[in-house]
Each structure stands twice: as structure tokens, then as C-alpha cells.
């Protein structure tokens, strides 16, 4: 029987969609099987606009989200005294769309001036579905005592203390900038200032927990970072013409500056994330902003007003700056009219802004009570599925507990610097950046990245000499001399590897710039393989919509022998288990069972036999075709007696050609996130990045490396 949780807003502007998305992410992180049910679409600009929460969920996850009823239809039923008919239809839709879910999350209606019946309707829906009620409230400009009164008032509207289905409250927008009416007013621009300046209360969350008449299930502080919109969204809102597209789809606008002053008085506003608004007949501002962009300042965008044509000579002068990704767009309205249009910009997260949705979900989820989420499925006997959010959450939590130092040899690379900052912020690991400290700080500043505690910077020039004797000692059998050692230590990967070998750091991550060979060769020469391992292999974690699969080896061994393939299978199974994935190993071939012959099939068959002999505790079967390994209906006909077919979680490919091709085909055609390659079999953890790695890829690879180090410590003790 599913548990039904209904989130009910106590008023307007409480951030209901954000809280709903955060609660969903909290449940995903705990592996809860859930459905989302919005009984009635929240009216937006124009009654035909789709429901915001439902649209975002469908665009950003595989969770079932039923189509809500249109408000016009609901109003027709209510006005004709057919509330019973409405409730029956809601119940029918509820049961149609929430089968097999452990938890059903229901989102209520926000009461507005036009829909003042929303509270009564929410209460009726909650009773009809026998839902546990969780209020969502924003702090506004209330004191803790005033907030307590508002929570008490909300509870009394839903049956008071006698209603045992009232579970608790989630307090949102803690310490947000608000005006005298308690409305949230993020300060994007000085032109928006007026006599009613926004204020921030700075209330300690512990006061709210102690003061609330019902349990506080979450307390979400205001975060300005979550409202940083894309430049493309600003351009669409203004119906602007694109002059230079650049990174318009990814650049974030964190502030708006109207450039009406002289250049010396404007320079402080030429900073990362600024939307610079200026008349198109001010080429001095445009050229100055372009100079800043060429110096590495990631300006959010430039908005030109007035519709004046840009002189071709100015365009040519700015060409190199445009190539840095600087977005430039233009409107025909003057600066004053444009400022009015900007004030009406809706800061809601667009459904297609996947990066912002992900950031918002993770942020809100981090402030939701994990004890409450655990309690939702405490009595369930269903095994937890490891969804992609659950896997990433598990990685982050395990890495935090490990508390490791990870060296990043490509310390001045922009993505690496951003990733190090994120790792420090989340407590994933202490990142050690190798590189010129001034250059690293310059790159960080130009990107608006702060490198505080949790990020160490080591200048290779200052420390290389102390590693020369150790390198000579380790490679003396190969004829290593001090002169050659100094030359090799010019490579930061070699330096980082020696730091790892000496135990000064716990792991190494490289490859954003270096090739796989350059990343792996020094560790193989200086650190060697782990005891009991005869080779190094790799796995990718493939984050499918509803589960995580392990692919090996897709990066290291070109054509392993049967003996090597069996070891890769065992290494991969152990890696899967270490990260919470139950290993059911499929040895992949073009033939299933005994249906085919040939040297390639025989190699897989022999590797399967060897792996089963070495590790009888593991569930391993092969040869299996990919479709038989992953699809239950195919498995029934091709391998009905296989313990793995149709339910494999670990896929071992016969060679690098097959593995790498399959991994990339699945990743690209299904638009999946993959984490890896994670190297297996090293004495100390070293991991390689793709040269096209995103910042998140680096973050999760650092987390993997930290966890591997903790596991190596555990195995050695």
C-alpha cells in the first residue's frame, strides 16, 4: 500500500515547486519508488500554460507524473455544485497513475486572489486521498513567534490538533531578501531599488525548529545562486535579436548593470555573471566589456538597447572577444523601457534549464529531514533500487565520510578549478591543485569561483626538487638519473603520482587535458598494481533513468585473454558491490549460451568458467548477447535458465573495441550520464578523465577516487 504525502502551500510565493522538486530528490536519493500526482493544474500566465511542476518533472526525470485537471474544468464542476464528481475523478486519476509506487507525492494548489477556494479544495483532496499533510510556508518578514502563529493558523484550517494526518511543515526561503509586505525581492540591479529596500532577517534555523507547533521536516535557506538565470532566457523574455550567440545557452546572469556612467566608474561591474545593459551607440562600453572578456572575465551577457546598428569596424575589433563565448543581444526599446521589461522577468526555473533544476533539487534536498524520508518506507519490504540520484548521493556521502586528499595535476585548468571548489563546498574531498598559484587564482576569479578552505594549491616549481631522490630510487633499475628525473618531474602527473606514492595524498585524478596514456603510465611505473591483481582495468557507471549499470572494460585493455577477462569480471563485480550495486555479471558476446562457435565466443565461455571457479560467491553467466542480458522478455526465450539474463547489472565486454563502442553508443543515443572510467587493480587509486569532461564529471570522479582510497585502507587493515 502506497503512502500518500500532500504538500500544501499556506499562501502565495512559498516556493512550492522548488520544495516539491527537493522532496522528490530526497526520496530518489534514498531509493524510494515514487509517483507524483498534481490533481489540478496551477493556473499561470494564461490558463492554457502547462502546470510548472508537472512540466519540470517530465523534462528532467523518468518519474511518473499524471496530467493534472485543467482549472477551467474544475471551476465549471464547482460552480455547478459537482464537487463530489470532481473528487471521484481525482481518485480515479490517482489510482490510474500511481500503481507500484511506495510513496505518492501530491502537490496542492496555491491559494490566489482569483482562486481563494484553493485551501478548502486542498483540504478536501487530502481527506479524499487519506494523505499525510505537510505544509509549505515561507518565512517572509515574520519573527519566529509570528511564524509559529501562522503555522498554528494553517493547522487549524485543516482540522487542528485532532487531524492526525498533519505530519509537519517545511519552511522555505529562510532569510530571503523581503520587502515590507514580506515578498521576496532578489536584488539583481541597482535600477530596481526604491524606497522600500529589501531586508534580510538572519534568523537562526534552530529557533524555528524549537518554536514550531508541529514537526519541522525541512528548513531551506534562501540561495541567490538558485535564481541565476541563463542569458538565453533573458533574451527570449525581451524578444531580443542575437548579435553574437556565444555561450548564450549556458552563461548565467547573476546581476544586471545599466552602463550609463563613464568607463572608469563602470569597471567594477565588469564581473562574472553580469548582464551589462548599454545603449548600442556606446561603443566604448562594448569595447571595454570585450577587453574584460578577452582577459578571462566570464561576463554573463551584453544587452544593447536602442536598436542602433553596430559599426562594422567595432564588430571586427570585438571579434576575438566574441569567440570567447560572450553573448550579445539587442532590443529596439530604449534603456528606460528595457529596464521596465527586465523588472517583469519571471525568475521561475524554466523546465528545459536542466542544470538549474538539478542544482535546485540537490540544494533543497540537502535541507529536508533524512529521518522523515527514511520513515516513509521503514515498513516496506521492497528492495531499494539504486536510481541515478541515489547513486550520486551515495557517492557524495561515502566520499564525505572518507575525508581524503585528492591531487589534481591539471590545477590551472578552468573545469578542474570549478570542480575543486564544488568538492570543497560539498565536503567531498580536499583537492590539491598543482600549478602556479597566481594563475590558478586568476582563472578562479575570472570564473567567479572562490577557492576557500578545502582547496590547497601547491606550486610545482617550489616542491619538485624534493621528489627527485625518490623517483631515482624507484626507477634506478631502468637507469633513472637525477637529470632525467628532473625532466620527468616537469610533468605534473609524475609529480602528483610521487605525492600519492609517498602517501602525501590519497588519490589522483587527471585527464581533462592529458591523454589516458599520460595519466596512467606514471602510476603503472611508480605505484604498480594492487596485491592479487595482474592487470589494471576500468569500468563506467552508466546512469540509466531507473537504475545504474556497470560496463567494463571500455577504456584500458585492447584484447584481453580469457584469464584477463575473468579478472576484469571479478574486479568489476567487486567495484559494483562497493558502490551499492548488487553484482549480476553478464559476459557479453555475439552469441548466447551454446548457440555459437568461434574463437571469440570460446574466449568468453572460458573466461566465464574461470571467473566462476575463482569466485563461486558471485553470480556470473555467459556468453550472453546484450539484449538477452538486459531484457527480461528476450532472456525468457534465449536463456531461460540463466541466473543473470534479463537482470544483469554488470556487463563485461570481450574487448576494447566492443566495450568502448557500446558505451558511447548507449550514452549518446539515450542521452545518459556516465561516470568514469574508474580504474581498478591499482595499489592506490588513480582515475582518468575524458578530455571532454564536464565539471560534474570531475566532481564525481574525485568522489569515486576518495571512496576507492577508503576501501583500499579498509582492505589493508
Curated annotation (Swiss-Prot):
One BP annotation, GO: acetyl-CoA biosynthetic process
Q: Name one GO cellular component term.
A: cytoplasm
Q: Where in the cell is it found?
A: Cytoplasm
Q: Record keywords: Acyltransferase included?
A: yes
**Catalytic function, reaction form:** acetyl-CoA + phosphate = acetyl phosphate + CoA
UniProt key word Transferase:
yes
| NCBIfam families for the chain | PRK05632.1 (NF004167), PRK09653.1 (NF007233), pta (TIGR00651)
User: What name does UniProt use for this protein?
Assistant: Phosphate acetyltransferase
Please tell me the species this chain comes from.
Yersinia pestis
Q: Which gene encodes it?
A: pta
Amino acid at each position: 500500500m502506497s503512502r500518500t504525502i500532500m504538500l500544501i502551500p499556506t499562501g502565495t510565493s512559498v516556493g512550492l515547486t522548488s520544495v516539491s522538486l527537493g522532496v522528490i530528490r530526497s526520496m530518489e536519493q534514498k531509493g524510494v519508488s515514487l509517483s507524483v500526482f498534481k490533481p489540478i493544474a496551477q493556473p499561470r500566465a494564461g490558463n492554457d500554460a502547462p502546470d510548472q511542476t508537472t512540466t519540470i518533472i517530465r523534462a528532467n526525470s523518468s518519474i511518473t507524473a499524471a496530467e493534472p485537471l485543467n482549472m477551467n474544468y474544475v471551476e465549471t464542476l464547482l460552480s455547478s455544485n459537482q464537487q463530489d464528481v470532481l473528487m471521484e475523478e481525482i481518485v480515479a486519476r490517482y489510482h490510474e497513475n500511481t500503481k507500484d509506487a511506495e510513496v505518492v507525492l501530491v502537490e496542492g494548489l496555491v491559494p490566489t486572489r482569483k482562486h481563494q477556494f484553493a485551501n478548502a479544495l486542498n483540504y478536501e483532496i487530502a481527506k479524499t486521498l487519506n494523505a499525510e499533510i505537510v505544509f509549505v510556508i515561507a518565512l517572509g518578514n515574520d519573527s519566529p513567534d509570528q511564524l509559529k502563529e501562522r503555522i498554528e493558523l494553517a493547522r487549524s484550517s485543516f482540522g487542528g490538533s485532532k487531524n492526525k494526518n498533519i505530519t509537519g511543515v517545511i519552511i522555505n526561503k529562510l532569510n530571503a531578501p523581503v520587502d515590507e509586505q514580506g515578498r521576496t525581492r532578489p536584488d539583481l540591479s541597482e535600477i530596481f531599488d526604491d524606497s522600500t529596500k529589501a531586508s534580510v532577517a538572519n534568523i537562526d534555523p534552530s529557533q524555528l525548529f524549537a518554536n514550531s507547533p508541529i514537526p519541522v521536516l525541512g528548513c531551506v535557506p534562501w540561495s541567490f545562486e538558485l535564481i541565476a538565470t541563463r542569458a538565453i532566457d533573458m533574451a527570449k523574455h525581451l524578444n531580443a535579436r542575437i548579435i553574437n550567440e556565444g555561450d548564450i545557452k549556458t552563461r548565467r546572469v547573476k546581476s544586471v548593470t545599466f552602463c550609463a556612467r563613464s568607463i572608469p566608474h563602470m569597471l567594477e561591474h565588469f564581473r562574472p555573471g553580469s548582464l551589462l545593459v548599454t545603449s548600442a551607440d556606446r561603443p566604448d562600453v562594448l569595447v571595454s566589456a570585450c577587453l574584460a572578456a578577452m582577459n578571462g572575465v566570464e561576463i554573463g551577457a551584453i544587452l544593447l538597447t536602442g536598436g542602433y546598428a553596430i559599426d562594422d569596424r567595432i564588430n571586427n575589433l570585438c571579434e576575438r572577444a566574441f569567440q570567447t563565448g560572450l553573448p550579445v543581444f539587442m532590443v529596439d526599446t530604449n534603456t528606460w523601457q528595457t529596464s521596465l521589461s527586465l523588472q517583469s522577468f519571471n525568475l521561475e526555473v524554466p523546465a528545459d534549464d536542466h542544470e538549474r533544476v538539478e542544482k535546485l533539487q540537490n540544494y533543497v534536498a540537502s535541507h529536508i529531514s533524512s529521518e522523515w524520508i527514511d520513515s516513509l518506507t521503514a515498513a516496506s519490504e521492497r528492495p531499494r533500487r539504486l536510481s541515478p540520484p541515489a547513486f550520486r548521493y551515495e557517492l557524495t556521502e561515502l566520499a564525505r565520510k572518507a575525508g581524503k586528499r585528492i591531487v589534481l595535476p591539471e590545477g590551472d585548468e578552468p573545469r578542474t578549478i570549478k570542480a575543486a571548489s564544488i568538492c570543497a563546498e560539498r565536503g567531498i574531498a580536499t583537492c590539491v591543485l598543482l600549478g602556479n598559484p597566481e594563475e590558478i587564482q586568476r582563472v578562479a576569479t575570472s570564473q567567479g569561483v572562490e577557492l576557500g578552505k578545502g582547496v590547497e594549491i601547491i606550486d610545482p616549481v617550489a616542491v619538485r626538487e624534493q621528489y627527485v631522490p625518490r623517483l631515482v630510487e624507484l626507477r634506478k633499475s631502468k637507469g633513472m638519473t637525477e637529470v632525467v628525473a628532473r625532466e620527468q618531474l616537469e610533468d605534473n602527473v609524475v609529480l602528483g603520482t610521487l605525492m600519492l606514492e609517498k602517501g602525501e595524498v590519497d588519490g589522483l585524478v587527471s585527464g581533462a587535458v592529458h591523454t589516458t596514456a599520460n595519466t596512467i603510465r606514471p602510476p603503472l611505473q611508480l605505484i604498480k598494481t594492487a596485491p592479487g591483481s595482474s592487470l589494471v582495468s576500468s569500468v563506467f557507471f552508466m546512469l540509466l533513468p531507473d537504475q545504474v549499470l556497470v560496463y567494463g572494460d571500455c577504456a584500458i585493455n585492447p584484447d584481453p585473454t580469457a584469464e584477463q577477462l575473468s579478472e576484469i569480471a571479478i574486479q568489476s563485480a567487486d567495484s559494483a558491490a562497493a558502490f551499492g550495486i548488487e553484482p549480476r555479471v553478464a559476459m557479453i558476446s555475439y552469441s548466447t549460451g551454446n548457440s555459437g562457435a568461434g574463437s571469440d565466443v570460446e574466449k568468453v565461455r572460458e573466461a566465464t568458467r574461470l571467473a566462476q571457479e575463482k569466485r563461486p560467491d558471485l553470480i556470473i553467466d555467459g556468453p550472453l548477447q546484450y539484449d538477452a542480458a538486459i531484457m527480461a522478455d528476450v532472456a525468457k526465450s534465449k536463456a531461460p535458465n540463466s541466473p543473470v539474463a534479463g537482470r544483469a547489472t554488470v556487463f563485461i565486454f570481450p574487448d576494447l573495441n566492443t566495450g568502448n563502442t557500446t558505451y558511447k553508443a548507449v550514452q549518446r543515443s539515450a542521452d545518459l550520464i556516465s561516470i568514469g572510467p574508474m580504474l581498478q587493480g591499482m595499489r592506490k587509486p588513480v582515475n582518468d578523465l575524458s578530455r571532454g569532461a564536464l565539471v560534474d564529471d570531475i566532481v564525481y570522479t574525485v568522489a569515486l577516487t576518495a571512496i576507492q582510497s577508503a576501501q583500499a585502507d579498509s582492505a589493508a587493515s
